[in-house]
A protein has these predicted regions:
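Active-site beta->alpha loop and helix N-cap motifs at the rims of alpha/beta catalytic domains
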Residues: 2-152, 157
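Basic phosphate/pyrophosphate-binding loop/patch that engages nucleotide-derived ligands
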Residues: 162
Length: 162
């Protein structure tokens, strides 16, 4: 994987929950209050659209709305990592490009996953992350999430970091 950035991030980057109203619709004013609270409480950065943020229950339009609304509101006060996970390489790369264009400092991506019984081998995992990396100029945080069902060996992670 190519080196994308010399920026060094450190400190606390909590996952921002997605705020919904009583009808299950996005509550953007509530979302921005939550973001402000996390920044005012001393967060060094934020991570949006992660598993805890209910990313899998959001439509693409809702993801885009949250990404642009939050990044515009944060306006560089802290770095924001945007989760762009998708099992399809093309979709993940496009989500990552859009996150970069909106101002994300980094994207967080789970390995490709295809349900409970279909596993992607290490060559496929490497190709997936290489394609996403080639699509953007910001770093990728690889999320080793057990929910994906795709294990990432220490050796694979170390080799991709080089």
């Amino acid at each position: 994987m190519s080196q994308k950035s010399t920026a060094r991030y450190q400190g606390v980057f909590p996952v921002v929950p997605t705020i919904f109203d009583s009808q299950g619709e996005l509550d953007l004013p509530g979302q921005l209050r939550c973001v402000d609270f996390m920044i005012d409480a001393g967060s060094n950065g934020l991570c949006i659209l992660a598993n805890f943020s209910e990313q899998f229950s959001l439509s693409d339009a809702e993801r885009e709305t949250l990404t642009t609304t939050i990044l515009d509101h944060v306006a560089g006060r802290v770095p924001v990592i945007v989760t762009t996970t998708h099992y399809g390489t093309r979709v993940c790369a496009e989500r990552s490009r859009r996150a970069q264009q909106a101002g994300a400092c980094m994207v967080m991506v789970m390995p490709p996953y295809h349900g409970a019984t279909i596993r992607v081998g290490e060559p496929g995992i490497r190709a997936f992350f290489q394609a996403v990396s080639d699509a953007i100029d910001i770093p990728i945080m690889i999320q080793d999430a057990p929910v994906s069902g795709t294990p990432l060996s220490v050796a694979l992670l170390a080799s991709m970091a080089k």
